[in-house]
Regions:
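Amphipathic alpha-helical "output/dimerization" segments
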Residues: 203-219
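Short strand->helix junction
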Residues: 60, 200-201
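Extended, charged low-complexity segments
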Residues: 195-199, 210
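GAF sensory domains
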Residues: 131-196
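Hydrophobic, Leu/Ile/Phe/Ala-enriched alpha-helical segments that form helix-helix packing faces
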Residues: 74, 78, 115-123, 215-218
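A conserved regulatory-domain signal marking ACT and ACT-like small-molecule sensing domains
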Residues: 2-106, 118
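Amphipathic alpha-helical coiled-coil segments that mediate homodimerization
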Residues: 97-132
C-alpha cells in the first residue's frame, strides 16, 4: 500500500480490493463514514478471477483526520484491502476513457498530446510523456508538468518501443527520482506514450489494456 499526503490537501484517491458480492460496497461506505469521510465518486477498475473487484474512490477527509484512519477503517472489514491512497486535486473527478476519446477526436492533429495530458487523471499516473524515436535517438517531445526530464540515454531505457510493456525503474533512474513503475505503449510507428507512478502501485492488466486501446486510436 502506498500513502502520499499533503498538509493542505483533504481530497484523496483510494484504490481498494473488495469481495465482489452484494453489500461489500455498502460496508466500505459505512466504514468510511465512521471516520468522517465523504465519498465523491466510485469507479470499478477491474473484476478479478478470484471473486474480487478493484474500485477507485475519491473521498473527502475532515482536516482533523489522517489518511491512516480511513485505511484502518476499511482494512478492518473482512476481505477488504487498501491498495493505495494518495492526495488528489480538489475538484478532480474520475475521468472516463470515453471522455478522453471525445477530447482526442475533437482535435485529431493533437490527439497524442491530448492523451498524454489526460493520462494522470484517466489512469491515476503521476506523469506521462510522449517519446519520439523516429531518428533512433529517443527524446521526449511532450510531457505533463510532473514528468521527469528525459535525456536520450534515459529515454532509451523505455525500449522496446514497438510493443506495450511494463517497466520497473530503480531509485535514481533519473536524477532525484525514486522507484518508479511505468507502462510503455506505441502510438504510431515512431512515437510511444509512457505513463509512470512514483513508488507504485503497479499498473493492472486492465489499465494497460485500456491505455493500449486509446493509444491505438491516435492517428
Amino acid at each position: 500500500m502506498v500513502i502520499a499526503v499533503g498538509k493542505d490537501v483533504h481530497v484523496f484517491l483510494m484504490r481498494l480490493t473488495l469481495p465482489d458480492r452484494p453489500g461489500s460496497l455498502g460496508s466500505v461506505a459505512t466504514a468510511m463514514g465512521s471516520v468522517g469521510a465523504d465519498i465523491n465518486a466510485v469507479e470499478i477498475v477491474e473484476k478479478t478471477t478470484d471473486g474480487s473487484v478493484v474500485d477507485d474512490f475519491i473521498v473527502d477527509l475532515p482536516p482533523n483526520q489522517l489518511p491512516e484512519t480511513i485505511v484502518t477503517a476499511c482494512q478492518n472489514l473482512a476481505g477488504v484491502r487498501v491498495e493505495w491512497i494518495a492526495r488528489y486535486p480538489e475538484g478532480g473527478g474520475l475521468q472516463s476513457d470515453l471522455e478522453a476519446l471525445e477530447r482526442m477526436t475533437a482535435d485529431p492533429p493533437h490527439a497524442a498530446e491530448t492523451l498524454v495530458s489526460l493520462c494522470p487523471v484517466v489512469f491515476r499516473s503521476h506523469w506521462a510523456t510522449l517519446i519520439d524515436a523516429s531518428e533512433n535517438i529517443p527524446r521526449s517531445s511532450y510531457s505533463t508538468t510532473l514528468a521527469p526530464d528525459l535525456t536520450p540515454e534515459i529515454a532509451a531505457r523505455f525500449a522496446p518501443f514497438d510493443t506495450t510493456h511494463r517497466i520497473d525503474l530503480e531509485s535514481d533512474w533519473s536524477p532525484g527520482w525514486g522507484d518508479t513503475t511505468a507502462v510503455v505503449t506505441p502510438l504510431t510507428q515512431d512515437r510511444v506514450i509512457v505513463i509512470g507512478r512514483l513508488g507504485g502501485p503497479a499498473f493492472l492488466d486492465s489499465e494497460i489494456a485500456r491505455l493500449h486501446h486509446l493509444a491505438a486510436l491516435v492517428k
